[in-house]
């Protein structure tokens, strides 16, 4: 890209606004890594969104091993979380107080968790039993505290690749062929814009 910072408005997804156009979203998962303003770590489209914006956006210092990384968000879990959105998952709290993510084996929870809670972490929606599933990739805890998808979440994501599923074309994609065979040229040097 030729911009140093982007707002959460999809500008990074278009050459004309200083970003890079999406590749064929029936063959590739588009991932834009850039400097996002306002503390946003990332965001994603959902299956069925317009092809020219299809993919995920990740804050440049929320993954990797070198540079000025975000201390609590430097293990790549933002990418895991956003790709799961791209695969149809909602936040575990259903984006509303005691909401529903429509997954049979995730508990209801009041809202998102942050930091690294201790188990069990009970809330008004889960006052008994195991409490909130704060270690789920679809919560907002620190990267070091996230470690699982439930079986129900895995089934939902995998269903997108089934026959007639919105991501089914990936099963026959030639995108994993060598880059030169696919016709796409790689830059000789990749330097982040800071």
Feature map (PLM): residue ranges:
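Extracellular (secreted or membrane-anchored) zinc-dependent metallopeptidases
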Residues: 1-192
